């Protein structure tokens, strides 16, 4: 299987501009009023502020570094000069200086409360911008601790991404499991939620945790179905169901319904549809595949299409008799076959009715198959909430289809 990768978190958080975040700057005038300033330091700070306000941040930095060279700074001087230096470094996009100056401020022990949180927030993002992932992690952990132990969605996204890039997949998975619901609560965009789940999926791939991967892929199918996601589900369920035809046809039905079938899925769907005696589905997939270029218009496929259409016509001709016989028989198997006939003909309301009768009568070869057919027919009728119990029943009836039933249930409830 191809290696999964995580998207860059900078695209989610706008970290390229993180150093421009507003920070509380103590001006020389304010600091002098509090006392403890030497005139030569205050003069340099004032000149630096004027240079920065004029857009000359490099000159401001030079003047502030000269002020710091005047000997050990008193607490008031340190606060005023370094706050201005943080501001100037931000303006100059000198991220290394910005990080070093924030670290110096924090090391004094005089930065507390919201000011500490704000500085740690900027520092964590700055380290990520600089590519220092270990310091990104440690600083974000400090930030979460400063917030009282509960990180914001942005904190968790940044921490999880940095952990993933450091290949600490266990820690990344644990963090991203918190980040996704936090992002939803915070009203983050669908694109951010998708990227979070994609990174979480990649972490579980590296950890070889198939069960958690499937749970994550199910969530992705709910919020934004993609061919890449669906293709992974097909690979997983081919293996876990041992290519069970009921599991696979219902998975392909989901892919077709959400328009995420990969090129090779059209022919596979058609093949399994013919195997389970659903020629209408086979014909539809062959035609769609040929129209999209996914299936070659060669003699073999043309014969398959013609054969599927011929079978479909035979079903139409015998439909009335099949329905009379199914209703007359006390066991449910004939109604189950009738339900499939109606489904393959595209009559989903009649398919649902026949499937319900089959389940009421019982004595079925594959109850899970009938539960799935009922659920999918109800989905086609836009009755998703009604379909959920059918998928839950299929999930309990047969472990081979449990995963496919679960993803259908999740989509129905989403």
Per-segment meaning from a language model:
Residues 37-46, 75-82, 112-122, 148-158, ...:
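Generic helix N-cap/helix-start motif at coil->alpha-helix transitions
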Residues 331-414:
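C-terminal soluble interaction/assembly domains
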Residues 51, 89, 127, 163, ...:
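Residue at a conserved register position within TPR or TPR-like alpha-solenoid repeats
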Residues 2-8, 20-104, 108-118, 407:
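N-terminal leader/linker segments that initiate helical-solenoid repeat arrays
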Residues 32-37, 68-74, 104-113, 141-149, ...:
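Solenoid-like repeat scaffolds
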